[in-house]
């Protein structure tokens, strides 16, 4: 497996997947993945973090040994890498013989610039999705996915989503049991499927407003299964019911009961995705996912 680096790559886009694949080797007790790095120059820099890294080889030194998997991280240098002729030529040549090519975050811009993703469903960091659409209109950009598989190409969202991508690849290659072992080893709270949201409902809500409504969202998240009524929520915000409902609707654009339903539904979907809880247990954990419980 080869990680193609460039000046200005995001170190977490490299470190997260690298550690996951390394841990898979350790958990399996055999070298499932042989990991290496390559770039146009012997040393690359991360720019923002000031880190410098010596790679295992350069494009000029590279021969024709088979590559089973290519992975391109994202980073602020992705645009410059996309315009670098030697980088594009090497990527196209090696992709032609690789059974699988992947990107993390804005690494999708690099693959797209090489013409590898035309007509495919792809994802990237949600902040960069609109720009990817504008620069590469032939792509079908889905900005609310953790990762997407389209043929031999796998693209993922930003930073920690690279770990989710790696865990999915390990499961595909070796099986769910080893992937779960790696997740536990990395102390990953919960493995996320590719179709889960990049940006959680809680963060969406918290980004919109300040206290007391942000604090209310946190309180509800901490006790989702509680019998939250509108009066309970109003009391938590130290408001009368009427004032609370008016201000809440002005901030969020929906009723308090709808926000409660969305938070419960998101948590329920995440728990069900693990396959470890029955539907009944999930409901006990999060409470009812309809609006009739709060009034």
Question: Residue ranges of each PLM-predicted region?
Answer:
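Basic/polar phosphate-binding segments, predominantly the helix-turn-helix DNA-binding elements
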Residues: 219-221, 226-266, 283-295
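N-terminal beta1-alpha1 cap of cysteine-dependent amidohydrolase-like domains
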Residues: 1-61
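Accessory alpha-helical/coil subdomains and C-terminal extensions
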Residues: 174-218, 226
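Basic, amphipathic alpha-helical hairpins
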Residues: 171-175, 208, 212-229, 248-249, ...
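A conserved active-site-flanking secondary-structure segment within enzyme catalytic domains
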Residues: 117-146, 181-182, 186
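Flexible gly/pro-rich beta->alpha loop and the following alpha-helix that scaffold active-site loops
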Residues: 36-101
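Catalytic nucleophile loop
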Residues: 90-127
């Amino acid at each position: 497996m080869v990680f193609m680096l460039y000046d200005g790559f995001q170190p977490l886009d490299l470190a997260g997947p690298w550690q996951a694949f390394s841990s898979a080797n350790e958990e399996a007790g055999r070298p499932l993945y042989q990991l290496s790095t390559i770039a146009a120059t012997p040393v690359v820099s991360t720019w923002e973090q000031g880190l410098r890294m010596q790679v295992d080889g350069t494009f000029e030194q590279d021969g024709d040994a088979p590559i089973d998997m290519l992975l391109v991280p994202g980073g602020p240098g992705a645009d410059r890498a996309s315009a670098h002729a030697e980088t594009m030529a090497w990527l196209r040549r090696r992709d032609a013989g690789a059974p699988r090519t992947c990107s993390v975050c804005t690494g999708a811009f690099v693959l797209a610039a090489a013409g590898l993703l035309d007509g495919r469903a792809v994802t990237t960091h949600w902040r960069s999705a609109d720009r990817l659409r504008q620069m590469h209109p032939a792509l079908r950009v889905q900005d609310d996915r953790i990762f997407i598989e389209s043929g031999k190409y796998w693209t993922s969202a930003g930073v920690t989503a690279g770990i989710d991508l790696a865990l999915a690849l390990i499961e595909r290659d070796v099986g769910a049991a080893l992937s779960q072992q790696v997740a536990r080893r990395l102390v990953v709270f919960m493995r996320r499927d590719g179709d889960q949201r990049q940006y959680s409902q809680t963060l969406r809500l918290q980004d919109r407003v300040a206290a007391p409504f942000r604090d209310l969202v946190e309180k509800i998240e901490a006790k989702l299964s509680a019998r939250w009524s509108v009066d309970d929520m109003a009391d938590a915000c130290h408001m009368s019911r009427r004032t609370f409902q008016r201000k809440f609707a002005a901030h969020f654009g929906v009723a308090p009961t709808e926000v409660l339903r969305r938070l419960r539904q998101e948590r329920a979907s995440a728990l069900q995705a693990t396959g470890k809880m029955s539907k009944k247990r999930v409901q006990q954990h999060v409470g009812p996912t309809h609006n009739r419980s709060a009034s």
